[in-house]
From Swiss-Prot:
It comes from Clostridium botulinum (strain Eklund 17B / Type B). InterPro entries: AP_endonuc_2, AP_endonuc_F2_Zn_BS, Xyl_isomerase-like_sf, Xyl_isomerase-like_TIM-brl. It comes from the Bacteria. This is Probable endonuclease 4. The keyword Nuclease applies. The gene is nfo.
C-alpha cells in the first residue's frame, strides 16, 4: 500500500482533517501545529482527538506528520528567537502526546552569518533541551535546499546535528525531494547513488518521512519553490522511481505541492496508479 497524504488545514480540527484525507484517497496527512508564524495554538479538543484516533484506526492510517511553524529559527543570532523556538517546539511536543506515536517535522533554521558550526551547535542544543525520554513523538529534521544561510543543506550537516543529540532514538529525518534536488542531489538520474550517500552519512534507518514535491527550478538552483507532480524539473518518471524504490516505498509520503484539495486528490490518484508494490 502506498502511504500518502498532503498538507491539510487544521482550522476545523483533527477529525475534519481525517475526513478530508479520506475524501482525497489519502491515509495520512501533514498539518501545522499552529499558525505558520508561530502564534498561540488552539486549545486541544480531546473529544475531537478521540474521534480522529478512532477514524484513523478504522481506516488504517499510517503516522501523521505535524509541521512546526516556518518562522522558528533554533539557530538564530538573536537569543530571544532561539528561546522562542525552543518554547514553541516544547509546547508542540507536549500537545502531540494527545496523538501518540506520530511525527513532528521542523526546518533546522538559518545561522545568519554566524557560521554553520555555530548553527549546528545551537540546533543540537535546542533539541537536547526539548526532547524527553518518555515522549512518543519522533522529531524530524527536514533536508533543506541551501538558500541563504540555511543549516541542513547537505547530509553531513544533518548528520552532525543528530550526532550531538543525546536522545537519538527520538530524532529522524524528513527528506524533501524539491529541497534535495535544488541542493544538488541528483534524484532524477542517480537516485540509488543519492540513497547510498544518505545511508553512509546519516543512515537510512533515520529516514522516517518524505515530502514529495516537484521543483519549479533547475537542479542545484538552491531556490526551494515547489511544483505540482510531473510539472517541474524533477518530473513524473523520477517521482515514480522514488515511491517505488525498495528502500523508500514503505515510508509515508506527504505532498506539499501548490494545490487545493481537488488537485491533491488528482495527484494521489496519479501516484497510486504509478505505485507498483
Amino acid at each position: 500500500m502506498l502511504n500518502i497524504g498532503c498538507h491539510l488545514s487544521s482550522s476545523k480540527g483533527f477529525k475534519n482533517m481525517g475526513e478530508n484525507a479520506l475524501k482525497i484517497g489519502a491515509n495520512t496527512f501533514q498539518f501545522f501545529t499552529r499558525n505558520p508564524r508561530g502564534s498561540k495554538a488552539k486549545d486541544i479538543d480531546e473529544n475531537d482527538v478521540k474521534e480522529f484516533l478512532e477514524l484513523a484506526k478504522e481506516n488504517n492510517f499510517c503516522k501523521i506528520l505535524a509541521h512546526a511553524p516556518y518562522t522558528l529559527n533554533a539557530c538564530s543570532a538573536d537569543e530571544r528567537n532561539r528561546e522562542f523556538a525552543i518554547e514553541i517546539m516544547a509546547d508542540d511536543l507536549k500537545r502531540m502526546e494527545y496523538l501518540p506515536n506520530n511525527l513532528y517535522n521542523f526546518h533546522p533554521g538559518s545561522h545568519v552569518k554566524q557560521g554553520t558550526e555555530v548553527g549546528i551547535e545551537y540546533i543540537s542544543s535546542a533539541l537536547n533541551s526539548i526532547l524527553k525520554k518518555d515522549q512518543t513523538t519522533k522529531v524530524l529534521l527536514e533536508t533543506m535546499s541551501g538558500k541563504g544561510t540555511e543549516v541542513g543543506r547537505n547530509f553531513e550537516e544533518i548528520a552532525e546535528i543528530i550526532k550531538r543529540v543525546e536522545l537519538k532514538e527520538h530524532v529522524g529525518v524528513c527528506l524533501d525531494t524539491c529541497h534535495i534536488h535544488d541542493a544538488g542531489y541528483d534524484i532524477v538520474n542517480e537516485l540509488d547513488k543519492v540513497l547510498e550517500e544518505f545511508n553512509s552519512i546519516i543512515g537510512l534507518d533515520k529516514l522516517d518521512a518524505i515530502h514529495l514535491n516537484d521543483s519549479k527550478n533547475p537542479f542545484e538552483s538552491h531556490k526551494d519553490r515547489h511544483e505540482t507532480i510531473g510539472n517541474g524539473y524533477i518530473g513524473l518518471e523520477a517521482v515514480t522511481n522514488i515511491i517505488n524504490h525498495p528502500k523508500l516505498c514503505h515510508l509515508p509520503f506527504f505532498l506539499e505541492t501548490p494545490n487545493e484539495l481537488e488537485g491533491y486528490k488528482n495527484e494521489i490518484e496519479l501516484l497510486k496508479s504509478a505505485y507498483k508494490k
